[in-house]
């Protein structure tokens, strides 16, 4: 073999770190898309429950009533759901407190069912006054957190989400960008923060479960390599 002859370089292989980062980025995008569509679906369902207050079940215009809100509301709810669902596991990792309480899909589905039930109660049950409605929904929302979360970070994020979402919603209403069909604006404000709090806890649980599944898949792939 001649001295000047050099071997042609073979195909470059990505290191395990680059491969892991790429895999995590793709999984993060997939989780965001899944959370977005879950948020859009829940927004449509919960909007239907609010519209159905004091109305017979499945009226003729039920399909039209699902999309009676402003067109941009479901996408905004989906975007917020994606942000919340991705934020919860990130906060857990940052605090070094991995959430391990009731980490299975059956628990997550029960949490979603309870959240829908809380929203259904706010739409269907008649209370004597708005204070009684607020206290009842607050107790139910905190009960949802205690049953399916019990983390300090989850409670803190839920309160922050409820406060921020309520303020943004009120600003939109005051500026005429969005309006409620209910003539009793005080009634709406009495249940809105509780619904946002419960929704934040619910989407956080979904996001945590998706993140835990991603960690399992990445761990299995790295073990195989």
Curated annotation (Swiss-Prot):
Residue numbers on the Cytoplasmic membrane side: 1-28, 89-103, 149-153, 208-225
Cross-link (Glycyl cysteine thioester (Cys-Gly) (interchain with G-Cter in ubiquitin)): 215
Motif KxHxx: chain residues: 219-225
GO cellular component, one term: SREBP-SCAP-Insig complex
Topology, Lumenal side: 52-70, 127-129, 176-189
InterPro entries found in the cross-reference section: INSIG_fam
Site (Required for the recognition of 25-hydroxycholesterol): 115
The entry's keywords: Cholesterol metabolism, Endoplasmic reticulum, Lipid metabolism, Lipid-binding, Membrane, Oxidation, Phosphoprotein, Steroid metabolism, Sterol metabolism, Thioester bond, Transmembrane, Transmembrane helix, Ubl conjugation
Residue positions where Cysteine sulfenic acid (-SOH) is found in the record: 215
List of residues that carry Phosphoserine: 151
Superkingdom field: Eukaryota
Pfam families for the chain: INSIG
A GO MF label: oxysterol binding
Membrane topology per record: Multi-pass membrane protein
Transmembrane regions listed in the UniProt entry: 29-51, 71-88, 104-126, 130-148, 154-175, 190-207
GO terms classed as biological process: cellular response to insulin stimulus; cholesterol biosynthetic process; cranial suture morphogenesis; inner ear morphogenesis; middle ear morphogenesis; negative regulation of fatty acid biosynthetic process; negative regulation of steroid biosynthetic process; roof of mouth development
UniProt-annotated location(s): Endoplasmic reticulum membrane
Record note on modification: Phosphorylation at Ser-151 by PCK1 reduces binding to oxysterol, disrupting the interaction between INSIG2 and SCAP, thereby promoting nuclear translocation of SREBP proteins (SREBF1/SREBP1 or SREBF2/SREBP2) and subsequent transcription of downstream lipogenesis-related genes. Polyubiquitinated by AMFR/gp78 at Cys-215 in some tissues such as adipose tissues, undifferentiated myoblasts and liver, leading to its degradation. In differentiated myotubes, Cys-215 oxidation prevents ubiquitination at the same site, resulting in protein stabilization.
Family indicated by similarity: Belongs to the INSIG family.
Protein role: Oxysterol-binding protein that mediates feedback control of cholesterol synthesis by controlling both endoplasmic reticulum to Golgi transport of SCAP and degradation of HMGCR. Acts as a negative regulator of cholesterol biosynthesis by mediating the retention of the SCAP-SREBP complex in the endoplasmic reticulum, thereby blocking the processing of sterol regulatory element-binding proteins (SREBPs) SREBF1/SREBP1 and SREBF2/SREBP2.
Assembly and interaction partners: Interacts with SCAP; interaction is direct and only takes place in the presence of sterols; it prevents interaction between SCAP and the coat protein complex II (COPII). Associates with the SCAP-SREBP complex (composed of SCAP and SREBF1/SREBP1 or SREBF2/SREBP2); association is mediated via its interaction with SCAP and only takes place in the presence of sterols. Interacts with RNF139. Interacts with RNF145.
Domain notes: Binds oxysterols in a pocket within their transmembrane domains and interacts with SCAP via transmembrane domains 3 and 4. The KxHxx motif mediates association with the coatomer complex.
Listed name of the protein: Insulin-induced gene 2 protein
Taxonomic lineage from the root: Eukaryota, Metazoa, Chordata, Craniata, Vertebrata
């Amino acid at each position: 073999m001649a001295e000047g002859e050099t071997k042609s370089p073979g195909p470059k292989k990505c290191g395990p770190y680059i491969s892991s980062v790429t895999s995590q980025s793709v999984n993060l995008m997939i989780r965001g898309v899944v959370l977005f569509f879950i948020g859009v679906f829940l927004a449509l369902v919960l909007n239907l429950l609010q519209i159905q207050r004091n109305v017979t079940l499945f009226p003729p215009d039920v399909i039209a009533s699902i999309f009676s809100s402003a067109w941009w509301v479901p996408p905004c709810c989906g975007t917020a759901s994606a942000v919340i669902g991705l934020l919860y596991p990130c906060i857990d990792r940052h605090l070094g407190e991995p959430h391990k309480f009731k980490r299975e899909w059956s628990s997550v589905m029960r949490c979603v069912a309870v959240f829908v039930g809380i929203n259904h109660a706010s739409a269907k049950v008649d209370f004597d006054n708005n204070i009684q409605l607020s206290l009842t929904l607050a107790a139910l929302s905190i009960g949802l957190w205690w049953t399916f979360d019990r983390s300090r970070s989850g409670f803190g994020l839920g309160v922050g989400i409820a406060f921020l979402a309520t303020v943004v919603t009120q600003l939109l209403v005051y500026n005429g960008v969005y309006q409620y069909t209910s003539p009793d604006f005080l009634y709406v404000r009495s249940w809105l923060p509780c619904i946002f709090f419960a929704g934040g806890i619910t989407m956080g649980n979904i996001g945590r479960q998706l993140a835990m599944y991603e960690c399992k898949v990445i761990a299995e792939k790295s073990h195989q390599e």
